[in-house]
């Protein structure tokens, strides 16, 4: 633990000094931004059915730094140092993103490790060929632990047309991701009659070719629909929508059906299962009530269901902000289904409760 802290503290100190007004020139041409987030979280698993500790603790330190020089050059990095204790203590430093970019007119060039989001789905994605793995029980990546891929990207905008070409490694400098291959991908985006649409073609080195398309359409201020269609050996389909009530509550619903092929199959799922069908429902509200003491609260409740084996998992999140620096939260999960023959029923606990606090500067 001490080794990781000693590595991160000088880095954070450098970020603070980078914006020292005494070291800045009289007429600065650059813009610097930085932040530091510290999270302490404790968790408890009730009804644990496997050997091991039922309680754990997580300490997470996340510094970010960004520098922009004029309208052309930019640099950004985001790190995550974590110390997890669950019976034993493990330490890790993750490089979430580190990249440099250059802009020349309508052309953007980027090189480095970066997080992309090409899929339009909230809890699932069929076309997010370069996206971090989507987790239906944590679609927002609440602890910000997702990592990007090392890549070179060229993006050119011509009117309402957007052309993006990407080459992504399977882990050029970092360790190779499980099952990842070098990927060459092309994305074409265009707005058609209010539909924000995109077509994507990609090829993995030594693997198969991927083709897909997605769309997003907003109607007024309350309704949004989205969909994805992808083909890699077989078809994967996603349909979803979001509706915002006058009370401020937001409802998100999605239906997702991936084939049971090597690319779409979750780790540990047998090949004999066949095509799967999932449902997702989320109800939430930010600023619970516009009253002192209430508007700092955010709550969400979600349900993920496997329609084939009847298993499901419920998720509840509640959080409260204090003076724009502190955020206390609760995260709970409760799976259900046949323990031996269902996806979510096989999760080895009856409930998981996590309570934490975050400080940001």
Over which residues does each language-model region extend?
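Detector for outer-membrane/organellar transmembrane beta-barrel domains
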Residues: 28-34, 192-194, 216-305
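Outer-membrane beta-barrel "beta-signal"
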Residues: 279-283, 327, 347-361
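Outer membrane beta-barrel
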Residues: 66-170, 190, 337
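Residues that define the transmembrane beta-barrel architecture of outer-membrane proteins
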Residues: 53-61, 91-96, 105, 146-150, ...
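Membrane-embedded beta-strand positions of outer-membrane beta-barrel proteins
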Residues: 34-40, 77, 109-111, 154, ...
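Transmembrane beta-strands of outer-membrane beta-barrel pores
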Residues: 40-48, 69, 79-85, 104-106, ...
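Repeated loop/turn-to-beta-strand initiation elements of outer-membrane beta-barrel proteins
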Residues: 71-75, 106-109, 160-165, 192-199, ...
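Transmembrane beta-strand segments of Gram-negative outer membrane beta-barrel proteins
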Residues: 24-49, 73-77, 161, 299-301
């Amino acid at each position: 633990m001490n080794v990781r802290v000693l590595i991160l503290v000088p880095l954070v100190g450098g970020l603070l000094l980078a914006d020292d007004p005494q070291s800045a020139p009289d007429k600065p041409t650059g813009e610097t931004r930085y932040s530091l987030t510290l999270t302490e979280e404790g968790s408890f698993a009730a009804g644990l059915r496997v050997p091991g500790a039922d309680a754990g603790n997580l300490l997470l330190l996340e510094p970010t730094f960004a520098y922009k020089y004029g309208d052309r050059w930019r640099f950004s990095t985001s790190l995550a140092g974590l110390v997890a204790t669950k019976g034993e203590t493990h330490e890790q430093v993750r490089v979430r993103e580190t990249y440099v970019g250059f802009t020349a007119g309508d052309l953007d060039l980027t090189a480095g490790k970066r997080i992309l989001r090409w899929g339009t789905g909230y809890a699932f994605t069929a076309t997010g060929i370069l996206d971090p793995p989507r987790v239906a029980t944590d679609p927002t990546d609440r602890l910000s632990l997702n990592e990007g891929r090392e890549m070179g990207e060229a993006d050119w905008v011509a009117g309402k047309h957007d052309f993006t070409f990407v080459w992504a490694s399977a882990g050029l400098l970092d360790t190779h991701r499980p099952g990842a291959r070098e990927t060459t991908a092309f994305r074409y985006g265009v707005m058609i009659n209010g539909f924000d649409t995109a077509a994507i073609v990609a090829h993995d080195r030594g693997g198969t070719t991927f083709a897909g398309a997605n769309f997003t359409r907003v109607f007024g201020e309350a309704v949004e629909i989205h969909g994805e269609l992808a083909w890699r050996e077989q078809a994967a389909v996603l349909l979803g929508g979001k509706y915002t009530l006058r009370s401020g509550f937001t409802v998100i619903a999605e239906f997702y059906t991936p084939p049971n092929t090597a690319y779409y199959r979750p780790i540990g799922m047998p090949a004999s299962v066949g095509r799967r069908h999932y449902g997702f429902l989320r109800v939430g509200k930010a600023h619970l009530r516009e009253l002192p003491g209430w508007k700092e609260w955010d709550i969400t409740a979600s349900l993920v269901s496997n329609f084939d084996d009847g298993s499901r998992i419920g998720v509840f999140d509640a959080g409260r902000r204090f003076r724009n620096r502190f955020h206390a939260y609760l995260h709970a999960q409760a799976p259900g289904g046949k323990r031996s023959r269902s996806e979510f029923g096989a999760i080895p606990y009856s409930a998981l409760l996590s309570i934490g606090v975050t400080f940001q500067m």
